[in-house]
C-alpha cells in the first residue's frame, strides 16, 4: 500500500505530461498547416497574375512617361499603393538614375506615378481586371535625356513583374 499511492501519482503525472506534450505538438502542427494554406493561396494568386506592356510614350519635355499595361492574367490588380515602379534612365547630362517611384492617388508630382485611363473597364471601375488595360502615368525629375534608351520595371502586390524599354524624347 505504501508503494501504491506514489505509483498512482507518478502514473497520473506521466499521463498528464503526455497529454500536454501531444496537445502542444498538435497546436504547433495546426499553426504550420494554416501558414502553408496561406502560402499556397498567395502562390496561387501570383501564378494567375500576369501583366503585359502594350505601349510606352514620353512627352517632349522628357518629364512625363506613360506606360500602358494589359492584365493578361486571371486575377485583378487593385492595390496600386503596394505596386512598385522602378526606372533606370539617363538624364540630359548622361547621368544614370535608378529610381523607385512611389504611387500617389493625388495630383502627379515629381518622382511619383498614378493610374491614368483604363481601357475596357467594364466591371469594377479603376480596378485592373483580366483583359483590361491601364495607363501608368509617371513624372520624373530630372527629366529623361533625349534619344536615350531606358528601362522601367513594374511589380504588382503579388510579386509579379514586367519590364520594358522606352526611348527618351526625340
Short names for language-model regions:
Residues 124, 132-138:
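Short strand-edge motifs at loop-to-beta-strand transitions and within beta-strands
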Residues 60-66, 146-150:
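Short, solvent-exposed loop/turn segments enriched in Ser/Thr/Gly
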Amino acid at each position: 500500500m505504501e508503494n501504491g499511492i506514489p505509483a498512482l501519482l507518478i502514473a497520473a503525472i506521466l499521463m498528464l505530461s503526455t497529454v500536454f506534450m501531444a496537445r502542444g505538438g498538435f497546436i504547433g502542427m495546426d499553426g504550420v498547416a494554416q501558414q502553408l494554406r496561406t502560402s499556397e493561396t498567395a502562390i496561387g494568386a501570383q501564378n494567375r497574375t500576369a501583366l503585359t506592356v502594350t505601349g510606352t510614350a514620353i512627352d517632349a519635355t522628357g518629364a512625363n512617361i506613360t506606360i500602358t499595361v494589359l492584365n493578361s492574367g486571371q486575377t485583378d490588380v487593385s492595390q496600386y499603393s503596394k505596386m512598385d515602379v522602378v526606372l533606370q534612365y539617363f538624364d540630359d547630362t548622361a547621368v544614370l538614375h535608378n529610381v523607385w517611384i512611389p504611387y500617389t492617388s493625388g495630383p502627379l508630382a515629381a518622382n511619383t506615378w498614378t493610374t491614368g485611363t483604363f481601357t475596357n473597364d467594364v466591371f469594377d471601375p479603376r480596378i485592373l481586371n483580366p483583359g483590361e488595360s491601364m495607363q501608368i502615368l509617371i513624372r520624373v525629375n530630372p527629366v529623361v535625356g533625349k534619344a536615350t534608351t531606358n528601362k522601367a520595371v513594374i511589380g504588382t502586390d503579388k510579386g509579379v513583374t514586367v519590364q520594358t524599354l522606352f526611348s527618351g524624347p526625340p
